[in-house]
Amino acid sequence: MRQECIQAVQQAAQRTLTAREIQNIEDRIYRNMRSIARDDPMSWRQLSESERLYRAAQLASEELQREAALKKRRVALTIAARQRLDKFINSYQGADGKLGALNRTIAFNADGKSNFLSVESRTKATRDYALSQLQEAFEAVDPRFFGLFEDEAGVRDLVYEMRGQNTGNAKARKGAKAWREVTDLLRRRFNDAGGDIGYLENWGIPQHHSMEKVGAVSKDKWVSDVIGKLDRKYYTRADGQLMNDAELSAFLGEAYNTIATGGLNKLTDTGMRISGVRANRGNASRQIHFKDADSYLQYQQLYGDRSLWEIMVGHLEGISKDIALVETYGPNPDHVFRSLLDQVKAETATANPSKTGSVERLANKTENLYNFISGKTQPVANPHIARWSDNIRNWLVASRLGSALLSSFSDLGTMYLSAKVTNLPMNQLFRNQLEAMDPTNRTELARARRAGLAMESLLGSVNRWAMDNMGPSVSRWAATAVMRASGLTAWSDAHKRAYGVTMMGSLGEVVSRTPDLRSLDDSDFRILKSKGITDTDWSVWKLAQQEDWGNGNNTMLTPESIMRIPDSAVKHLGEPERVKFEAMRQLLGAVTEEVDMAVITPGAREQLITGSGIQRGTWKGELTRSVFLFKSFPISVVMRHWSRAMGMPSAGGRAAYIATFIASTTILGALSQQLNDLASGRNPREMTGEDAAKFWLGALLKGGGLGLYGDFLLSDHTRYGSGALASMLGPVAGLVDDVVKIAQGIPLNAVEGKSEQTGGDLVKLGKGLMPGANLWYLKAALDHMIFNQMQEYFSPGYLRKMEQRSKKEFNQTYWWRPQDVTPQ
C-alpha cells in the first residue's frame, strides 16, 4: 500500500495503524477484488483499474464496519445474557441455592421450581420445530420397512434438488425447499443471538465424515480423492488469489488430521475439545465445498457412514444446541458460564464454610452437566473398543427386548398422573390416546408431527432403552428393527402425541379465556408457570389463530399457529421473527418437557448418571455403559417422578403423589406381568393367597418405578440362568457369566457322562442371543416349536423338570405346556 493511501486510511480511522493492520487491510482489498472478479466477471471486465480498487476498498470498509458493529453487539448481548442469568440466580429460592439455580439453566429439572427454560429444553424445542417442517424431506427419501432403509433414487433426487439441480421429482423439490427454509431460519436465529454464519447460496447440505473410514487411508490418498471433487473458487489465500494445488493439498491435510483423529489434534490440556466463541461456529464448518451433487454423493459413499436423513438431523441438532447456548449464556457461553460458576461457587462456599465439600461436588456436577450438554466431551479413545461394545449392547437390545412393550403399561400410570398435576382434561386425553393408537389414522400422525410432537421415531432413536451409538451397524439396525417390530416405538410415540396434543389444546383454551399470565391460578397451573413463560410470550400466544383438529381438539395452540401470526401484529413487542420464534419455542419447550415426564424419555441428567459423559472407547466408559444398559429408563422414572413428588407444595401433596405413583404403576405392572406370562405360554398367577407377596413384589419391580429390574430379578433368565449379581451388573455381565459357566461345565459334563447337557446349555444361550426371538407375539411359538424341542433332545426330561420347578417355586401352571409343540 502506498504511503498516501496509508495516511488516508489512518486519517479515516483517526489513529495510527500498526504495520500488521495495514497489511490486513491491503489483503482484504485484494481478496475482495478477486472475489468480485470471480462472482461477477462480466461487470468486473468493464471496470477501470481505479474503479476496481474503489469497489474492493468500499467492500473492505463495509466488512470492517460490520465486524466492528458485530463485536459491539456481541458485548451488548453478553451483558444482557449475564443480567438475565444474574436476575434468575438471585431470585431463585430453592434449597440448592445459587449453584442449584445455575445448574437448572443447563438441563430440565422435574420438580417444577426452575421457572427457566433450560439449554436442554431450548435445544429440543428448536430441533423438533425444525424437524416438524421437514415432513416433505422425510417422505422424499421414502423410508421403508420400519423406516430402516432409504430409497437410493429418492436420496439422489433430494441431494440434487438441494444443490439446485432439477430432477423432476416433485417430492424431492418440496423437501429441498423445506430444508432450505428451515436451515435458513435457524441460521438467522443463530445470527440474531450473536452468531456470524453468512448466506452461502449453493451450500445445500452439510457433510459427514467417518473417522474410521478416513483414518483407514493415508493422508495423500484422502486428499487425492477429495481435491477433484471441490469447487476451487472457494479456496483462496488471504489476499484473495486462488490456492494452487500444493496450498489446497496442505489445507486439506489439516482437515484430514482433524477428521482422522476425531479432534485429538485440537485438545486442551484437560482432554476436552477446544471451543472458542461459539457464535463464530458455522464459518469453519463449511470448509469442504463440493462442486456438485454427484461429487457430494461420491464422497459420502467413500468416506461417510450415515444416511442422508441422519446427516440432516445431525446438522439440525448441532445448530439447535448452538442457538440454545448463545441465547442462554451469550455469544461466548463457555466464558460466561465459567465466570458464573466460579463466582457462585466462591460465594456459596464463603457463606457456608462447613459445606465446602458438598459445594465442590455440586459445582463439579454442574460443570460436567454443562460439558455434556454443550458437547465438550473427549474424543473416542479407541474406536474398535467402542464399536465392539456398541455391537454387543445393540445385539442384547435386539435379543432381549422383544417383549418390552408388555413392560410399558406403566406409561399409562405416569401419563395420567402427569396429566393430573398439569391440570389436563382426562377425558380428552383418553380420546386422543385412542385416536393416536389407531395405526390407520395418518391424519393424526401428520398433524402431531407438524406440531413438533413425538419426534423420536423420526430421529431413529432407541434411546429409551439403549445407549448412545458410534454410528450405523448391523447390530444397531437389528436393535431398531426389533424395537419397531415389537410395537414399542409405535406405543411410545402414540402416547407422546396424545399427551402433547391434549396439552396444546388445553393451553389454547386457557390462553383464550385468561387475559394475562398473572391471572392464572397458582394451584391449578403451578407447573405451567414454572416454565419461564413471559408476559410477552403470553401476549403472542393470544394473537395466534387456534386450530380445530376435531375430536374435541378445537382450541389447538400449535407452533405453526404462532409462526403464522402476521409480523405487523407483533412488531410492537420487538423484532417480529424473534418474538414469534421465542414464543413458539416456549410453547414447544413446555409441552416437550411434560410429554417426556408423562412418557419417560431419559434426558441429559439421567444420561450423565448412566455413563454417557464418560469417554467412549475406554474400558471404564464401555463397562459403565454396559452396566447401565436397560437401566436408563427405570432410573429416569425414579429420578423424575421422585423430583416431581418432592417439588409438591405440601407434605400431603408429596405423600399423595408418591402413593398414587406407586399404586398406579404397580397395578399396571401386575397387568404387564400377567400378559408376559400368557405370552410365554404360562397361566396367569394367583394374585391372592400365600404367594400374593411374591406376585405383588414382582408387579412393583416390573411397573412401579424399577421397570426392567423386574425382568432381570424375576425373569426366566434369572430363575434358571445367571445369578442375581450378574443381572444387577447388567445384561453384558450376565452374558459373560453364562459363557463362563458353559465353558466350566464342558469338562465337568464330559467327566460325568452328561455331554448332552452342554448342548442344552448352548441352545439356551443361543436362544437368548437371537434377535427377535423374544418378540412377545412370537416367543411362545418359537419356544415350543423349536427351542424347547432342541432342549429336550439334548437334555431328556429338562422340560418336565422346568414345569415342576415352575409349579413348586412359583405355583404356576401352563396353558401351553413346554413339551407340547401346539397347545393341547
Question: PLM ranges: what are they?
Answer:
Residues R2-L185, I205, E212:
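Low-complexity, small/polar and acidic-rich linker and loop segments
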Residues S210, V214-I319, I323:
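Long, charge-dense tracts
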Residues L748-Q824:
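Hydrophobic alpha-helical segments
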